Amino acid sequence: MFDLTGKHVCYVADCGGIALETSXVLMTKNIA
């Protein structure tokens, strides 16, 4: 799960590797 600000909430909650990859994608989109 991710909030509207792009914070990797799911990663913090230890959701797994998929969350880590997704957070990287979201962070990239936020920067772009």
UniProtKB/Swiss-Prot annotation:
Record's keyword annotation contains Oxidoreductase: yes
Listed GO MF terms: oxidoreductase activity
Superkingdom to which the source organism belongs: Eukaryota
Annotated residues for binding of NAD(+): 11-32
Keywords: Oxidoreductase
Family: Belongs to the short-chain dehydrogenases/reductases (SDR) family.
Protein name from the UniProt record: Alcohol dehydrogenase-related 31 kDa protein
Organism of provenance: Drosophila yakuba (Fruit fly)
Lineage, top ranks: Eukaryota, Metazoa, Ecdysozoa, Arthropoda, Hexapoda
